[in-house]
């Protein structure tokens, strides 16, 4: 009755992670400075503002899964005994505490749940609780602790007979790769991403041979998991300045998301923005503008929660194309929207960009 958590525990968790661990959140990429095509342009994450007209990548798997995959059973109300019912209630309380950004309370509750799971010898409950504890440690930036907990979760799953290519194992492997990426353990990170991507691609090829006319939910979730792995790998390659490789990964991830989720899905828009960021970093400003303009149009249509960030990115690309007046207008709109969202990080960044743009304009006159 226990389902492993999806990669995202919801947008609230990602926001909480961003507040608590700027460089080691679910977004993972620390601030970086480097030459990007035409000069010293800065690529950085939302959590790490930097001076200069840099594009702000919308990093993270915001909503790859629009619904949970049916890889295991979810905790329900039909607990078979009192101990399991109590464990389920504790896990629900812990998840609620996490969503309310109360990690200390969640940790205490999870330890109680784990104790009960061991006392009742409930292997599924033990596995589920370890996974939730690992996710909590990860979003708090406790990477070494998260690593050990994820490995413990994987050990329990494999020990219970789960196959190595099961989506749940791939998700944990992806989380471990992201931890290694945050720790700048390049060899381990890239090996982890390669394992996840190659395993899923092989799995999808085998499933194609048995494919029916209508894609099953399980197959769709496998595609989405592959897209999430490509997305994560692309972010790390972008951070590592392997820009052309990052571009290819983003292109594949975007194609998957468009096909499965649709062009208007929030995650599709995020990927368009990230791909534009990567193109911009290589000096491909015209191509970057096409993707970012489309992303901003779609973000307006669906009232995307991070429209202000897309607009900020669009303005940065307009500056690179020397369209300063239009860039200023877009930045001003982005600033108003960021203030309404009370996104202090973006507000600070956009104000700095506007100030820099003003100085640049004075030098040109």
From Swiss-Prot:
The record marks 70-71 as: Cleavage. It is found in: Mitochondrion inner membrane. One of its GO terms (biological process) is mitochondrial respiratory chain complex III assembly. It comes from the Eukaryota. SMART domains: TPR (SM00028). Proteolytically cleaved by PARL. Its main location: mitochondrion. Keywords: Electron transport, Membrane, Mitochondrion, Mitochondrion inner membrane, Repeat, Respiratory chain, TPR repeat, Transit peptide, Transport. Disruption phenotype: Mutant mice show progressive neurological and energy metabolic decline, decrease complex III activity, increased production of reactive oxygen species, extensive astrogliosis and accumulation of ubiquitinated proteins in neurons of the thalamus. Compatible with a Mendelian autosomal recessive trait. No evidence of embryonic lethality nor evidence of obvious neuronal loss. Coiled coil: none annotated. Residues 1-52 form a transit peptide. GO terms for cellular component: mitochondrial inner membrane; mitochondrion. Disulfide bonds: none annotated. The keyword Aminoacyl-tRNA synthetase does not apply. TPR repeats lie at residues 127-160, 220-260, 269-302, 308-341. PANTHER family: TETRATRICOPEPTIDE REPEAT PROTEIN 19 (PTHR13143), TETRATRICOPEPTIDE REPEAT PROTEIN 19, MITOCHONDRIAL (PTHR13143:SF6). Belongs to the TTC19 family. Binds to the mature mitochondrial complex III dimer, after the incorporation of the Rieske protein UQCRFS1. Interacts with UQCRC1 and UQCRFS1. Interacts with ZFYVE26 and CHMP4B. Required for the preservation of the structural and functional integrity of mitochondrial respiratory complex III by allowing the physiological turnover of the Rieske protein UQCRFS1. Involved in the clearance of UQCRFS1 N-terminal fragments, which are produced upon incorporation into the complex III and whose presence is detrimental for its catalytic activity. This is Tetratricopeptide repeat protein 19, mitochondrial. It comes from Mus musculus. The lineage of its organism: Eukaryota, Metazoa, Chordata, Craniata, Vertebrata.
């Amino acid at each position: 009755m226990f389902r492993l958590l999806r990669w995202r525990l919801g947008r609230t968790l990602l926001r909480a992670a961003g507040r608590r661990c700027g460089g080691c959140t679910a977004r993972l990429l620390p601030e970086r400075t480097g030459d990007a095509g035409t000069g010293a342009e800065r690529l950085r994450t939302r959590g790490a503002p930097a001076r200069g007209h840099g594009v702000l990548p919308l990093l993270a798997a915001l909503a790859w899964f629009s619904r949970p995959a049916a890889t295991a059973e979810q905790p329900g109300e039909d607990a078979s005994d009192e101990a399991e019912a109590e464990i389920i209630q504790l896990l629900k309380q812990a998840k609620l505490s996490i969503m309310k950004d109360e990690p200390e309370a969640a940790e205490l509750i999870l330890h109680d749940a784990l104790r009960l799971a061991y006392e009742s010898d409930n292997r599924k409950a033990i596995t589920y609780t370890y996974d939730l504890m690992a996710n909590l440690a990860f979003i708090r930036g406790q990477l070494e602790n998260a690593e050990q907990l994820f490995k413990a979760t994987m050990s329990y799953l494999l020990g219970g007979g789960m196959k190595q290519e099961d989506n749940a194992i791939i998700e944990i492997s992806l989380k471990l790769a992201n931890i290694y990426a945050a720790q700048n353990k390049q060899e381990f990170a890239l090996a982890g991403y390669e394992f996840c991507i190659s395993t899923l691609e092989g799995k999808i090829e085998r499933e194609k041979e048995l494919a029916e006319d209508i894609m099953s939910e399980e197959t769709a979730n496998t595609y989405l998991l592959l897209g999430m792995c490509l997305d994560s790998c692309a972010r790390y390659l972008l951070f590592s300045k392997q820009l052309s490789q990052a571009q290819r990964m983003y292109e594949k991830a975007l194609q998957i998301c468009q096909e499965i989720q649709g062009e208007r899905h929030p995650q599709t828009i995020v990927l368009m923005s990230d791909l534009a960021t990567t193109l911009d970093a290589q000096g491909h400003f015209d191509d970057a503008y096409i993707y970012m303009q489309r992303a901003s149009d779609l973000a307006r249509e669906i009232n995307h929660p991070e429209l202000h960030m897309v607009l900020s990115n669009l303005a940065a690309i307009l500056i690179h194309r020397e369209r300063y007046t239009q860039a200023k207008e877009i930045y001003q709109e982005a600033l108003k929207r960021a203030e309404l969202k009370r996104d202090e990080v973006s507000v600070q960044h956009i104000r700095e960009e506007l100030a820099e743009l003003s100085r640049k304009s004075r030098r040109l006159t």
